[in-house]
Amino acid sequence: MRLILLGAPGAGKGTQAAFICQKFGIPQISTGDMLRAAVKAGTPLGLQAKAVMDAGQLVSDDLIINLVKERIAEPDCAQGFLFDGFPRTIPQADAMKAAGVKLDYVLEIDVPFDAIIERMSGRRSHPASGRTYHVKFNPPKVEGKDDVTGEPLVQREDDKEETVKKRLQVYSDQTRPLVDYYSSWAKTDPANAPKYRAIQGTGSVEEITQRALTALSS
């Protein structure tokens, strides 16, 4: 099972990725983890990436693709892999295709943006304990206070509505076009293209997982 998981920030990709990886016995690969591992291992590509990052520059798509090819050749990828948050752009997708990276599925978790904004901007946390709440879906007993200590809850910077909207805009501009890229490739070249599947990402975690498994068996 070789797949790409697509979806906006806050669509619940992380939860579903963990379940899919466990179910199929495959590793979850993100470019961040991959870069850190290559740098730590001191591989030639890792050293190249480190030099670029130390200079405060972005790692090129070519280097990322070479790291991807190196990573998926490792023994734990024998049964497949799940790419989370990669590719992010059309040039990266083109580079993957040109490099001959074979994929079985592209699975999109589709959640309306207003639902994501409500989901993320409603989160509150108690930093000292790590307890989390949601103003609508899992509210504290007393508004704005931790259930156990009564201390004030905070909203993380990442969860502020303005920040969420900015991240969704970046997703719309850069990554959302991949949905059209993979769905049209699947229609025009079904023999070589990965199967493109989209599922609704609203409802309970169990419902979404069931939709994902059904999509990946069709």
UniProtKB/Swiss-Prot annotation:
Membrane spanning residue stretches:
none
Annotated region LID: the residues are 122-159
Pathway per its UniProt entry is: Purine metabolism; AMP biosynthesis via salvage pathway; AMP from ADP: step 1/1
Q: Where does this protein hold AMP?
A: T31, R36, Q57, L58, V59, G85, F86, P87, R88, Q92, R156, R167
What Gene3D superfamilies does this protein map onto? P-loop containing nucleotide triphosphate hydrolases (3.40.50.300)
Binding-site residues, ATP: G10, A11, G12, K13, G14, T15, R123, T132, Y133, G203
> GO CC terms on record?
cytoplasm
Tell me which UniProt keywords the record has, alphabetically: ATP-binding, Cytoplasm, Kinase, Nucleotide biosynthesis, Nucleotide-binding, Transferase
Described function: Catalyzes the reversible transfer of the terminal phosphate group between ATP and AMP. Plays an important role in cellular energy homeostasis and in adenine nucleotide metabolism.
Designated name of the protein: Adenylate kinase
Organism name: Acidovorax ebreus (strain TPSY)
Gene that this polypeptide is encoded by: adk
